[in-house]
Swiss-Prot record:
UniProt-listed InterPro entries: Glyco_trans_19
Source species of the chain: Helicobacter pylori (strain ATCC 700392 / 26695) (Campylobacter pylori)
Free-text function comment from the UniProt entry: Condensation of UDP-2,3-diacylglucosamine and 2,3-diacylglucosamine-1-phosphate to form lipid A disaccharide, a precursor of lipid A, a phosphorylated glycolipid that anchors the lipopolysaccharide to the outer membrane of the cell.
The name this protein goes by in its record: Lipid-A-disaccharide synthase
Listed EC numbers: 2.4.1.182
Amino acid sequence: MPTILVSALEASSNAHLEELRQNLPEDYRFIGVFEGKEVLYSPREFSIMGFRDVIGRLGFLLKAHKEMVQLAKQADMVLLMDSSSFNIPLAKKIKKQDPHKKIMYYILPQVWAWKKWRAKSLEKYCDFLGAILPFEVGYYQKKAQYVGHPLLDEIKHYKKDIKGETLVFMPGSRKSEIAKMFPLFVKAAQMLEQNEGFKRRVLVVPSFFKGLDLKALYGEDIQLFEISYDAHKSLFEAEFAFICSGTATLEAALIGTPFVLAYRAKTMDFLIARMLVNLHYIGLANIFYNALNNETPGLGESQLHPELIQHFLSVEGLLKAYKEMDRERYFKESLRLREYLKHGSARKIANEMAFLLNLT
């Protein structure tokens, strides 16, 4: 029975992990940080946004690192997913402790956007790098392979036309995001009802919020919305979506649902990020769309969907995006994007894990 140490801190990483586990034998045992049993910590305990938040939780993060390194002694291999600021140093410490321990990194950091030196660190400390973007492989020397994109495993239904019945609102999965984005989305929903007439409004809530007091998280205005824990189903049924940046933007693009990306960070965090990251776009769909059109990812001229970021974000801007988006063009180009990513990744990653464990 192989034991796998997992570090999956993000909601999206845990969705990808769940799909991966369906492609693995049932006798694989998982330990570490993820949504499931035998966990050291829940990913919810790592819900940190911004540079100040990291400094405030530094003691906890160092403690978690130390415990994960110790836990690695029990594991036959290590699976690291996304969250490079936590996982790259973790890989280094585990490899120093046991140079023969096999480490796989699945969902690579965005070295094409910033901190390109991380590519060398990953190749030094990891044994296999699973790239989920075709253009990522070019940033590595030898250990990276394009394995497909996990969303193409997880999404079960794709739109056949641009029609939809609902408006979907996705204000993020972190409390700080929700606090900033949800009030804007509420105002946009109310203005749309005044201007366009009533349409069903669906609020997509992260699945790990089940059992929590949603009114305490979102406020009294949550009663204006239908609640859904199924992002893919809700996006498939939607006419249009209002989405905080993140994996959900790519999910909408692959499903074929028109949307606007909306994001507002703390001013200091935004200014620091601007100094470190040189990108025109922050939306994954726009970044991939640049690559699809042979442009530098995140810096190209082509745009699949509108982005409203920081001081450009307003209720009026959200309404304008809803009214003016060329939905037929968007739908046609979203099909091209799906073809670009080709196929899912779970089966390939499962096979590579078996290889690292000497089971093939």
